[in-house]
Amino acid sequence: MTGAPSHATFPPAVILAGGLSSRMGRPKAGLVLGGRSMLTRVIERLRPQVAGIAINLNADPDPASAFGLEVVPDTIPGFVGPLAGILAAMRHTVRKSPGASHVLTVPVDTPLFPKSLAARLKTAITSGGEIAVAFSAGEMHPLFALWPVALADDLEAWIHADEKRRVRAFIARHESATVEFPLIPTAAGPLDPFFNINTPEELRQAEAWLPYLEDREP
C-alpha cells in the first residue's frame, strides 16, 4: 500500500516579507484579512505543503517570532528587491537543509495561493537545476517558485551586476518549468488564487472574496 508522502520529501519554504510595503503604508505580514493576519493565513496554507518554514524579514521580527519562525534577513543591504529575499532563502536552505535541492518561496501578500502549490511545482521539475514557476490565466507569478539552491552564487552575481534586478529576467536566464493553476470558480465569478494585496483597496477586495471561497479552493 502506498502511503501519504513524508514531510521529509517536501521542500523547505521561505515566506518573502522583506519589502518596504510602500503602497500599503505598513508591514503586510500584520494586516488583518477576515479576522486573521496575512502571515497567519500564509503559514496555515503553507505548513501542510512543506518540510519547514522560515521568513525573509528585514524589519520588526515580532510577527514571525509569535509563530516560532526563523527570521532570514536579506544578505545584501539596501532593500534591493525580492531577488535579495530569494537569495537569502537559498543561502538559508543550504545551511539548514543541506539535503534539499530547492527552496519554495511565497510572498506574504498573496494569502489565497493554491493548497497544491508545492506538490505541483515539485512534480514539474525534471532536473536539479530547473526552476519551477507558478502561472495562472497565462500570467507568471515569479515569487511563487521552487528555486535550485545551487543557483545562489549566480543569483548574487546577477543582483550586483543587473541594475533592474527583475525576477522574471533572472528566471529567463535559466532552465525553467511552468505550472498553470486554475482560477477558483465562485458564485461571484472566477478568482485568481494569486491575487496579491498591495494597497488598502486590494485588501478590501480580498475581504469581499472570502465569503465565496469556502470549499472552492484547489
UniProtKB/Swiss-Prot annotation:
Enzyme Commission number(s)? 2.7.7.77
Q: Which GO terms describe its biological process?
A: bis(molybdopterin guanine dinucleotide)molybdenum biosynthetic process
Output the SUPFAM superfamilies linked to this UniProt entry.
Answer: Nucleotide-diphospho-sugar transferases (SSF53448)
Q: CDD domains this protein is in?
A: MobA
Question: Where does this protein reside within or beyond the cell?
Answer: Cytoplasm
**Which InterPro entries does the UniProt record give?**
MobA-like_NTP_Trfase, Molybde_CF_guanTrfase, Nucleotide-diphossugar_trans
Single GO cellular component term: cytoplasm
Q: Which GO terms describe its molecular function?
A: GTP binding; metal ion binding; molybdenum cofactor guanylyltransferase activity
UniProt key word tRNA processing: no
Question: Catalysed reaction(s)?
Answer: Mo-molybdopterin + GTP + H(+) = Mo-molybdopterin guanine dinucleotide + diphosphate
Reported cofactor(s): Mg(2+)
**Primary site of residence:** cytoplasm
- What Gene3D superfamilies does the record tag this protein with? Spore Coat Polysaccharide Biosynthesis Protein SpsA, Chain A
- Enumerate the UniProt keywords alphabetically: Cytoplasm, GTP-binding, Magnesium, Metal-binding, Molybdenum cofactor biosynthesis, Nucleotide-binding, Transferase
Q: Which superkingdom? A: Bacteria
Binding sites annotated in the UniProt record for GTP: L16, A17, G18, K28, N56, D74, D109
Annotated Mg(2+) binding sites: D109
UniProt function note:
Transfers a GMP moiety from GTP to Mo-molybdopterin (Mo-MPT) cofactor (Moco or molybdenum cofactor) to form Mo-molybdopterin guanine dinucleotide (Mo-MGD) cofactor.
Question: How does the record comment on the protein's domains?
Answer: The N-terminal domain determines nucleotide recognition and specific binding, while the C-terminal domain determines the specific binding to the target protein.
Stated family? Belongs to the MobA family.
Would you tell me the protein name for this molecule? Molybdenum cofactor guanylyltransferase
- Record the organism: Rhizobium meliloti (strain 1021) (Ensifer meliloti)
Gene for this chain = mobA
